[in-house]
């Protein structure tokens, strides 16, 4: 059952300006693994990646309804890519399943996060059959 949906849109150029001005921004927003993936990208793709992760974490905070800082911190949320490029969101000490979509168009990134409460059967199914893709 879906228990939360969050959406966020950010201007990629604005996030790029923040990264250029505030050297600690990336350290405070991204986990070490996310920073590693970000640094593999150059130019426009680097800014898209950082803006996408920032936006996705904001969308997660909207889906939960309690924001960043009170119960969940930036580093508690990690979004890494599968080999095919699909982003996967993992949240420390969070018992619900999360789904994230990140899309870029022009100077904007839009993200959607869905939080789902799984039944016991669904949790067991994921444990034994972790690849739960549509295709």
Swiss-Prot record:
- What GO terms are given for molecular function? holo-[acyl-carrier-protein] synthase activity; magnesium ion binding
Cofactor(s), names only, from the UniProt record:
Mg(2+)
Q: Which domain of life is it from?
A: Bacteria
What InterPro entries does its record include?
Answer: 4-PPantetheinyl_Trfase_dom, 4-PPantetheinyl_Trfase_dom_sf, ACPS, Ppantetheine-prot_Trfase_dom
Catalysed reactions listed for this entry: apo-[ACP] + CoA = holo-[ACP] + adenosine 3',5'-bisphosphate + H(+)
Q: SUPFAM superfamilies from the entry?
A: 4'-phosphopantetheinyl transferase
Which locations, inside or outside the cell, does it occupy?
A: Cytoplasm
Cellular component GO terms, alphabetical: cytoplasm
A biological-process GO annotation:
fatty acid biosynthetic process
Provide the top EC class.
transferase
Keywords attached to this Swiss-Prot or TrEMBL record, sorted alphabetically, are: Cytoplasm, Fatty acid biosynthesis, Fatty acid metabolism, Lipid biosynthesis, Lipid metabolism, Magnesium, Metal-binding, Transferase
One Pfam family this sequence matches: ACPS
- Which of this chain's residues are annotated to bind Mg(2+)? 8, 58
Give the EC number(s) listed in the UniProt record: 2.7.8.7
What is the similarity comment for this entry?
Belongs to the P-Pant transferase superfamily. AcpS family.
Q: Which HAMAP family match?
A: AcpS
Role: Transfers the 4'-phosphopantetheine moiety from coenzyme A to a Ser of acyl-carrier-protein.
> What name has this protein been given in UniProt?
Holo-[acyl-carrier-protein] synthase
Q: Which organism is it from?
A: Leuconostoc citreum (strain KM20)
């Amino acid at each position: 059952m879906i228990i939360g949906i969050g959406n966020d849109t950010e201007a990629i150029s604005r996030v790029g300006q923040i990264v250029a001005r505030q050297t600690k921004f990336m350290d405070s927003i991204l986990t070490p693994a996310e920073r590693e993936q970000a640094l593999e990208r150059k130019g426009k793709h680097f800014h898209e990646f950082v803006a996408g992760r920032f936006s996705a974490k904001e969308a997660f905070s909207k889906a939960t309804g309690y924001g960043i800082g009170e119960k969940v911190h930036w580093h508690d949320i990690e979004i890494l890519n599968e080999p095919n490029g699909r982003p996967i969101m993992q949240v420390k000490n969070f018992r619900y399943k999360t789904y994230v979509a990140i899309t870029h168009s022009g100077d904007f990134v839009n993200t959607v996060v869905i939080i789902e409460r799984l039944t016991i059967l669904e949790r067991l199914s994921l444990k034994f059959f972790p690849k739960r893709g549509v295709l």
